[in-house]
Regions:
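Short, hinge-like loop/turn segments at secondary-structure boundaries
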Residues: 93-95, 140
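Metalloprotease/metallohydrolase-associated module, dominated by Zn2+-dependent proteases
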Residues: 141-200
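Short pre-active-site segment immediately N-terminal to the catalytic Zn-binding motif
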Residues: 50-54, 99-114, 158-164
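Hydrophobic or amphipathic, alpha-helical segments that drive membrane association/targeting
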Residues: 1-93, 156, 224
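Active-site His/Glu-centered metal-binding helix of metallohydrolases
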Residues: 107, 116-125, 169, 173
C-alpha cells in the first residue's frame, strides 16, 4: 500500500495549504533544534510499558504484521495507563505509537488492529512531523502563552484544521487493513465504550451527522 492510495482529498488540500504558510520552515527548524522528540522518548521509556516480543507478544506480533503490510519502518509501540480509550503517534525521526490501557481492556484483538492500523496510516501518509509540531506548539502555548499571544497563531490554526482532515486518511488505512466491519465495530466502541452489533444504525447516524455538518447553521458556528 502507498500513501497515494489512501490519502483523502481534504487531507491533501489542507497539507498543501500548510506547506505554503510563510515562516513554517523556521518553525520546523526551531522544533528540530530543541530536540523535543528526545523528550517524548524519555517520557515514554520512563512512564509507559514498551510492547515487544517479551511484553505483550501477541499484540506485538499483530503490530509487526500491520507494519510489514504497509511497508513502513517499525515505530516503537507503548502502552500508557489511562482508562480513556485513546491512541496517538508522534516523532518524525524517532516515531512511536502509544495506546491507552483503556483500549487494551475494551477492544478485542481485531479492533486493536484497527486502531494500530489507523496510527500506522498517519506514518504512511507522513503526517507525523506536522502532528508532532502541533502538539509541541500546544504545549508551548500553555507554558509560555505563545499561541494566545499570536506568535504562532496562523501556523497553529492551519495545523489544527489539517489535523482533523488527516484523520480521514488514517481511517481509510485502518478500514483497508482490517475491513469495514471490524473498523466500524472499533469506532462504535470508541464512541460509546460499549459493544454494538447494530452496524446499520451506526451508518445511519453517520449519515445524519454528515447532513448536519453540511448545514449552514453548523458551518457558521464551527468549522470541522
Amino acid at each position: 500500500m502507498e500513501a497515494k492510495d489512501i490519502i483523502h482529498p481534504e487531507d491533501a488540500k489542507a497539507i498543501k495549504a500548510i506547506k505554503g504558510i510563510p515562516g513554517l520552515e523556521k518553525a520546523i527548524a526551531c522544533f528540530m533544534k530543541f530536540g523535543f522528540e528526545k523528550q517524548f522518548r524519555g517520557e515514554n521509556l520512563g512512564n509507559m510499558i514498551r510492547v515487544d516480543a517479551w511484553n505483550y507478544p501477541v499484540l506485538y506480533h499483530d503490530f509487526q504484521e500491520l507494519v510489514k503490510k504497509l511497508g513502513i519502518r517499525e515505530p516503537e509501540l507503548y502502552i500508557y495507563n489511562s482508562p480513556y480509550m485513546n491512541a496517538y503517534t508522534y516523532g518524525e525521526t524517532s516515531t512511536f505509537i502509544a495506546l491507552s490501557s483503556g483500549l487494551i481492556e475494551h477492544l478485542d484483538r481485531e479492533e486493536l488492529k484497527s486502531v494500530i492500523g489507523h496510527e500506522c496510516g498517519h506514518i504512511l501518509c507522513k503526517h507525523v512531523l506536522y502532528k508532532t509540531i502541533l502538539i509541541t506548539l500546544e504545549e508551548a502555548g500553555y507554558l509560555f502563552g505563545l499561541i494566545h499571544k499570536g506568535l504562532f497563531l496562523p501556523i497553529y490554526g492551519a495545523l489544527q484544521y489539517w489535523s482533523r482532515k488527516s484523520e480521514l486518511s488514517a481511517d481509510r488505512c485502518a478500514s483497508v487493513l482490517v475491513g469495514e466491519e471490524v473498523f466500524q465495530s472499533a469506532l462504535a466502541k470508541l464512541a460509546s465504550g460499549l459493544k454494538s452489533d447494530k452496524r446499520d444504525n451506526l451508518i445511519r447516524q453517520g449519515r445524519a451527522y454528515e447532513e448536519f455538518r453540511k448545514s449552514s447553521l453548523w458551518k457558521s458556528l464551527i468549522h470541522i
